Each structure stands twice: as C-alpha cells, then as structure tokens.
C-alpha cells in the first residue's frame, strides 16, 4: 500500500525556515511509499513553474493533472484553466519531461474554467490537442 499526495497552491507559495513547503515534503518522504500527483494548475497559482518542479524531482510523479492556465478573469485565483496549448503553461514539454523520467504515469486532463464554452466542447478540444501532440 502507498500513500498518495495531490498538491494545491500553498505548498509552492508558503515556506518554513526559508524553504518552500513542497521541497520540505519531497525531501521528507520516501518515493517507495509516497506517490505524488502533480496538479499543474494549482502549482502555477502558487507561483511555481511546472518544468522546474519536474526537473527538480525526476521520477517522483505517478499522475499529473494536466492543465493550461490563463490569467483569471474573476475570483481570487491568479490563474484559471483553459484549453491545452492556449495558455502560459508549457504543457507538452512538461508531459514529455515526465514521460522520460517516470514509469506508468497517468495523465488527467483537467479544465475547471471554460471561457464561455461547454465542458464537453472543451474536452473535445483538449482531446484533439493531445492527439495532435502525439499522445
């Protein structure tokens, strides 16, 4: 049995003793016992960069909430999710980096904001993008 952890934004925006909470958690957990589910959108809302985190912790992620982000149009969040490839996240590069360093990773396409489109229309667009990228 393994324990799994899904990040939010605070792990990247808050620190303890000058060290980012996410870094503390990663160095304090055994990868054989604790799997990581990286949420790219939450990471960006916390002020981090997905490519940098994936490079820093190769092989540590068993699943990824794949999101692209744009500046939020309303609410308290800095960013909101959008169609893959339409925002500021280098999503394809992040997926490719994880695929090279990790085995059996699950990619969960997640979009929580739709910019006037229906969720189903967005899912169709995201699927088309993933196919275009070769996945």
Located regions from the model:
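Histidine-acidic metal/acid-base catalytic patches
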Residues: 16-38, 42-135
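Conserved anion-binding
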Residues: 2-14, 21-22
